Amino acid sequence: MQTVKMVITGPFSSGKTEFIKTISEIDVVSTERSITPDSVESQEKSETTVAMDFGRITVDNDLVLYLFGTPGQRRFDFMWEILAEGMLGFVVMVDSSKPETFREARSILETFRAYAPTPYVVAANKQDHADAWKPEDLRIALRIEDENVKLLPCIATDIEYVREVLLELLYSILEEMDSN
Amino acid sequence: MALKGNLAVFTTTQLLNLINLSKRSGSLTIFEGVETGEKMMLGDGRTQIDKLVAGKPLARLNFREGKLVFAEMQSKDGHLASILQRSGKLNEEQSRLIRQRAEALKMSDKGLALSLINANYVTQKDIIQSIQKHTVSIVFDLMTWKREPFEFKEGDQAPASRILVPIDLRNIIIEGTRIQNEQLELEKEIPNLDMALRFAEDPSSFKNIKLGANEWRVVGFINPKNSIRQIAKACNMTDTEIRRIVYALLQAGLVQMVKPQVEAKRRPDIRHPVPRNTPDRDVVNRLITKIKTINKTP
């Protein structure tokens, strides 16, 4: 049995867990912990990932794809390097409606690029939100000058978008193989 | 879809860069920030800043195809007579009388400008230069604002009565960046001096760009093989000085940050790359086939 893995990363509350839940064939193995009720984090969501999320897509008897979601909070970033090991590629999730998280998204992107020069795509999540920035604006805000890097609209709860993001990442992997 | 945010997390310079690069037309309004008593969480999940909501408008900029064409700020008198006075084309008494007359006759800026030119008070060039100076000074002021809410409205046009003077944003961005340089901010923008630089793909971006002596020195060393740290050493610059220059060049779209071709000397806090799993084509194709068939209901 061969297993391959992809990493879903991004800032706090960008939709990583939701993304994996939407496409995983198993109930996501989550390490979410409740956020203190009175904290600022709790205004965003009630639970946060502290170690990783884990989803699975079985291709056939010989091949399984694992999806690993990284913890969004910086204090758990020691997990990032562990999760990045051996990844095929990665998805950077960005909450398009929260410009206050763009700088962190860029920093995470650079960190993961430093871990491994694998292909990656950026998912402009929450495109159904009224205040969402358009993907082309996010490209400038995140300073992704390389037009070969795909910046894709996404709604992490919608299987169509999630499937498209993963497919585009796989196409990028193929393109990289061709260029090598 | 309006572009909304807060200058605490997306600065004036970044906004101008976005508008310039995407060649937008519309209006950018900066509002007074009204405290809500709540906090807003940044993307690292631990840093909190005050959550502000938009109050009364404080400033407005208008753009046409990425060029700045008009600016007004509540705290800066934008009447043409005042603008000409501030740039030394009219004295205080002239300005006062012309303003009184223009207001009595309900003249627009355009009408007033025509009257002043016909009366040989000023030339067309004087008016354009004075308005440019006024507009740019508003932008430089805005660059020092740190927390106000903003909103960009696509297609929203400047008042028809005002004189619109198109100004290329790239030189403003470079100059404004010089003004607003603050070490902490720059460190956040360019955290890793071990990255390298390369020139932008489009050589036309260099047209009409004015660089200072220090910027030219840095430009001479730009090469994907040289890390920013190495360039700073070669130019005998401090980390802050090199950050200032690289930030300006990045914002103007002249260079791009890339991983150095030859690995730069590592800083102790940079982690080593993890081993990479190289897949074969068959595995990737099987994954694609599988994912295409997934139709799970969320």
Over which residues does each language-model region extend?
Chain A
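Switch II (G3) loop of P-loop NTPases
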Residues: 59-77
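Canonical P-loop GTPase G-domain recognition
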Residues: 128-180
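A structural signal for isolated positions on well-ordered beta-strands in alpha/beta enzyme cores
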Residues: 7, 121-122, 150-152
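Conserved catalytic network of the ASCE P-loop NTPase/AAA+ motor domain
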Residues: 49, 58-61, 81-86, 112-116, ...
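Conserved C-terminal guanine-recognition region of P-loop GTPase G domains, centered on the G4
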Residues: 94-147
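Loop/turn-to-beta-strand initiation segments
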Residues: 62-65, 88-89, 118-121
